[in-house]
A protein has these predicted regions:
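Loop-to-transmembrane alpha-helix initiation sites
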Residues: 13, 46, 122, 151, ...
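Cytosolic-side transmembrane-helix boundaries in multi-pass membrane proteins
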Residues: 1-25, 206-209, 213, 217-220, ...
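Hydrophobic core segments of alpha-helical transmembrane domains in multi-pass membrane transport
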Residues: 16-28, 57, 130-135, 177-191, ...
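Transmembrane helix-bundle core of multi-pass membrane transporters
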Residues: 7, 122-194, 223-224, 244-249, ...
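Transmembrane alpha-helical segments in multi-pass inner-membrane proteins
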Residues: 226, 230-234, 243-308
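Alpha-helical transmembrane segments within multi-pass membrane transporters and channels
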Residues: 89-130, 282-283
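Single transmembrane alpha-helix segments in multi-pass membrane proteins
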Residues: 23-88, 113-120, 263, 267-277, ...
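Helix-loop-helix "hairpin" substructures at the membrane interface of multi-pass membrane proteins
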Residues: 92-100, 107-111, 165-247
Length: 345
């Protein structure tokens, strides 16, 4: 194997992409409709919310944190904006999206302040937030759905670009949710790769002590990462409402595991300092295609959860084993260099 090929295979994105192609091939062998344009677009539409939230979660995981309240944030935004639309008939999509982003960003910022200013462990801070939001929603909605949303948001959810009619007379095209997800990816990529803020977050995640020594404000960077994730959740929540045409306050129970799983499958390390937009996208698609393939193969939803959960555990375990090996190798190199230095002296 050439040195260049070895370096390519060492990139997490390449290995995830190879697994994605393998899953697609196996699923196609079981069901020939898997690779049809209609199915691929349905998969993307159904997972646009997951992908958008994963882009926000990526920043948090890069900092070495985690947010298990993401599902509760989604539910909160859908319920509050859904109630406004239901009771007033308000249907200005731009303002609704901005409101959703503001609500999600506020909750995310509160999470970030609890972690950065109060020093609470991320899992404790966000778990407490999730519990508080869930309790409020149960009290506020009594578990009832919100229906009768403005027609404009329903029509928006059905919007397709480059539409054509297939042989059956059905309309096929690129769903608007794909473009919204692409926008979320572009914003996240630009933030990480083209701004000092994004590079500072990467540096802090890799080595918080060194980042602070060179003058980076770790507390502000952490708070921003959680706020950004909340804004992405708010953006995704409105997209979800446009897809479902109604609001179910219980729709996102356990959803945070899907979001975290997609980011981890894409190569981000839970220890921080590692992760990319491309890897997260591939991880989300791998997650989505595995679920879709199992559905088309008529596998029970219970077994689907077991299989997907097992894959996530294997991915995390593999990454941690690889990280431990690299740490041991680096420690050995440091010891050898120290011994050589003493020998020269």
């Amino acid at each position: 194997m050439s040195e260049r090929l070895k370096r390519m295979m060492g990139h997490k994105e390449v290995s995830v992409g190879a697994m994605l192609l393998g899953v697609m091939l196996i699923s196609w062998l079981f069901n020939s409709t898997f690779l049809s344009f209609e199915n691929l677009m349905d998969v993307i539409k159904s997972n646009a919310v997951l992908g958008t939230c994963a882009m926000g979660m990526l920043l948090i995981i890069i900092t070495g944190g985690i947010d298990v309240s993401i599902g509760s944030q989604l539910a909160l935004v859908t319920v509050l904006t859904g109630q406004i639309m239901n009771r007033t008939g308000f249907d200005n999509l731009i303002l609704i999206y901005l409101l959703g982003i503001a609500i999600g960003g506020a909750v995310g910022l509160l999470n970030g302040l609890m972690v950065s200013r109060l020093g609470l462990p991320p899992i404790i801070a966000t778990l407490g937030m999730a519990s508080s939001i869930d309790g409020f929603l149960r009290y506020y909605t009594n578990g009832t759905w919100i229906n009768q949303l403005p027609q404009r948001i329903i029509d928006f959810g059905l919007t397709k670009f480059f539409s054509l009619r297939n042989a059956n007379g059905s309309e096929i095209g690129v769903p608007v949710q794909f473009l919204l997800f692409a926008l979320a990816m572009l914003v996240t990529w630009f933030l990480i790769k083209r701004t000092m803020l994004g590079r500072s977050i990467m540096a802090m995640g890799s080595n918080p002590v060194s980042a602070q020594r060179i003058g980076l404000n770790n507390k502000r960077l952490t708070a921003f990462a959680y706020a950004f994730s909340g804004m992405m959740a708010g953006f995704a929540a409105i997209t979800y409402t446009s897809i479902m045409k109604s609001v179910d306050p219980n729709a996102f129970i356990g959803y945070e595991m899907n979001v975290i799983g997609a980011v981890v499958l894409g190569g981000a390390l839970l220890t921080g300092g590692s992760g990319s937009v491309l890897g997260t996208f591939l991880g989300m698609m791998l997650f989505a295609f595995i679920s879709n393939g199992l559905t088309l193969a008529r596998i029970s939803t219970y077994w689907q959860s077991i299989i997907v959960g097992g894959i996530i555990l294997l991915a995390v375990s593999f990454d941690m084993i690889k990280l431990r090996r690299e740490e041991r190798r680096q420690t050995k190199v440091d010891i050898d260099m120290t011994a050589q230095g003493k020998g020269v002296a």
